[in-house]
């Protein structure tokens, strides 16, 4: 009986550990009854409350720089070039219905680029502000990482628009 109790407690602890990760559910056009593309995103971690951020659309002067802060800690990471035009974003979706969610899979701490400027949260919101399609968001994200470095540990991004869904 004692062994069963210990085994049960171990499974319970393993389940609790897994529940601290974010959860994404993605459905492509061919898998939904009405042809909709669906992305659901849940930040299952404690302390990640249901905040709904708004980034208004805008036109920016050539040469404008944008400050980047780590999404989790608020630490200043550096500056990037601002796009000439940015799009309206509410939560994790922009005015063109481009949607981005993420799931952290971590990784080895010694592999994190502490000199990088783009963390996972900044990648999401900057890409949403600069993209009209999911493919364009992927291009924006990969270009930003190539130019400015990636500050976070491992992430899986679910990126969708009304026509397709991708995992990056």
Label each region the model flagged.
Residues 16-21:
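Sec/Tat signal peptide C-region and signal peptidase I cleavage site
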Residues 128, 134, 152:
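Cysteine-dependent hydrolase recognition
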Residues 22-120, 140-168:
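A contiguous strand-loop segment
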Residues 137:
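Extracellular glycan-modifying ectodomains
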Residues 1-2:
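N-terminal secretory signal peptides that target proteins for export/translocation
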């Amino acid at each position: 009986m004692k062994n069963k109790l210990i085994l049960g407690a171990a499974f319970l602890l393993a389940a609790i550990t897994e529940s601290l990760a974010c959860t994404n559910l993605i459905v492509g056009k061919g898998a939904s009854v009405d042809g909709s593309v669906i992305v659901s995103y849940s930040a299952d971690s404690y302390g990640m409350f249901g905040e709904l951020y708004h980034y208004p659309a805008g036109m920016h002067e050539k040469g404008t720089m944008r400050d980047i802060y780590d999404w989790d800690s608020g630490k200043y990471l550096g500056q990037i070039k601002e796009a000439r035009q940015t799009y309206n974003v509410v939560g994790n979706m922009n005015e063109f219905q481009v949607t981005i969610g993420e799931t952290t899979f971590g990784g080895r701490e010694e592999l994190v680029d502490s000199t990088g400027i783009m963390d996972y949260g900044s990648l999401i919101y900057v890409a949403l502000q600069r993209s009209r399609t999911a493919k364009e968001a992927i291009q924006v994200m990969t270009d930003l990482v190539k130019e400015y470095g990636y500050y976070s540990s491992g992430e899986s991004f679910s990126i969708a628009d009304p026509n397709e869904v991708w995992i990056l």
